[in-house]
Amino acid sequence: YGYGMDGILRSRSDCLCGILNGIDFTANNPETDGFIVKHFSAAHPEGKAENKYALQKRLGLEEREVPLIAMITRLADQKGVDILAPVLDEMMRRDVQFVLLGTGEPSYEYTFRSLQSRYPGRVSANIFFDEALAQQIYASADLFLMPSKFEPCGLGQMFSLRFGTVPIARKTGGLADTI
């Protein structure tokens, strides 16, 4: 770390601070976003539920009032998929729904496709990436998973917070700094 400057940076740590990534609050605004079904805000949150029902319908999920857990990620060990995979069935034993959007290691793609086949109407494994669907997921989910092993900063937690979706993340890197 620090490109050979670790010692100098540590000795000056009292007067240094990191600069976080950021998101465009104009483009990522639940009050104006062109990708979502119904606009909403903290003052008028009822549109979030309408987005959830629309997403459930679009993805073939049962239209129910249960927690909708989402994950938008690259399917790789760094993103904590290897930590999550062994507990997916335990998670699904609860009355929840799960939506995944992302691609990556073929073994993890298979894991999520298999999960979807075991829990029809409750799991939607979308093994691709689509910006419009990502926005709809951020605007619709109740909880957003980010089990990353390391994350220099991360953006998913910022998008989820912007759209009123509670992030659940490992305490690491930028996730610890922004949640």
Task: Label the predicted regions.
Residues 1-179:
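Catalytic cores of nucleotide-sugar-dependent glycosyltransferases that transfer UDP/GDP/TDP-activated
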